[in-house]
Amino acid sequence: MKENKSDSTASHISDTVKAGAGLSELNTVRFISENSDKVIKDLLNFGVEFDRDENNNFTFTLEAAHSVRRVLHSGGDATGRKIEEALVKKISSNQNIDIYEETLAVELLVDETNECKGVIVFNNLTGEYEVIYSSAVILATGGIGQLYKYTTNPSGATGDGMALAFNAGAVMQDMEFVQFHPTALAIDGEENRFLISEAVRGEGAKLVDADGKEFMQKYHEKRELAPRDIVTRANYCEMQKNHSENVYLNATCINKEKLAKRFPTISKKCLEHGIDISKDFIPVAPAAHYMMGGIKTNIEGETSVRGLYAIGETASTGLHGGNRLASNSLLECVVCAYEVANYLKTLELQPPKQISGTIKDIIEKYSDEIYLEEIDVSEMRKNLQNIMWDGAGIYRSEETLKNAFEKIEQLKLDFHRTDKCLSKSEYEFKNMLTVAEMVITSAIKRKESRGAHFRTDFTQTNDMSFHSCLTRTSLEDSKAFLRNQNSEIVSYRQIR
């Protein structure tokens, strides 16, 4: 922001590219950084109140791999929630916007010319299907954290948009790059883990072992403020070395009043577990946090399927490369949303034309009573999460990845659902299986370690930077690829 005199666009670009491990698209990075001010002004106009000091100046925090304090925050440590609340309020007040709750998109309608014409949705409350035609379909469905045993993501982060787009023929990019946050609150029995913000380390907190000894000096010159992938692997290594379930974050060096004001949500959550962060060490461990890959798009959100757009974590613009710089995700969301909206205005969209066949014909396959009763997928979901954590997690190898793929193939047989499912949970699990295979397939093909993708059998980074691009038309293609037969599942694209 221009109000931040210690920062510059050039500095932000440099930090983003360095964190991206050689995969960030420079043109994308530059565009998003240069357009940050105007979207922040929009958020302010929408009612988002970013924190300010006693002189009414914005306050900025320091996060990992940033060279200066540049990250705005709201409500102390509730930035995402505050932005979401303001946007929901804005949307709810607009009578031109229809909101469908408890409704899940299950298929994109793509005609014979490879143009998206709409979507089939499933109402989880009534069990009924509906066809919605549209001249433009925008996917903004978030990430895939629920594929993993430990995650900071909400229960709905099951990769639904990625699976929808992939099944519709869209090109996927960099699906092997899953970011694991180094500091999630590690409480026994809790697998959906509460995020301990990087900003706590930015304010001076240190990572320590059970004896209170700092260890990050052994791993990187920036210590606690090294890029996320490095801090995550450092924490994991210390946990393995000490046969422990967590390391600790020591925030007792931060003024008590500052902790309470700057991190009210974290303070409250920790107190619920008997942890006073002004006095006690916080038990933390890595957890799946963010997907750098996704549906390949440009800045305007265009995918390889005409009429289909994607924004945010479900998209892959090339901004984050192999490792996302802290807080760039929110910035990307709002900048790209702004660009998609303005781009669609220029197209002078016409009312959508129905594809061949009646609505009844289109949803007929979902209406047949093929299955008698709903499957309880909770145990299969846990099984998948364990498979992905062990086989395609922080550390992976060809052996662990292929083993994971074989287990997922068996899960698909056990699940035995093709098109129709009987509940939201079944549809989500079907999508999770699809995305899991994408992650594994891409991770096997990238025979190097780069950013968040670390191979124990290929620990070095190749000299050549490339994006992986994934397309798949059938399950047999994946099997052929994993058997080292001729296949075009994964291709590559040079960095621009």
Feature map (PLM): residue ranges:
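N-terminal FAD cofactor-binding segment of flavoenzymes
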Residues: 1-50, 182-209, 213
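Short beta-strand to alpha-helix junction loop
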Residues: 24-34, 71-89, 100, 151-159, ...
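Glycine- and aromatic-enriched mobile tails/lids
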Residues: 42, 51-68, 111, 201, ...
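FAD-site-proximal beta/loop scaffold in flavoenzymes
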Residues: 107-131, 275-317
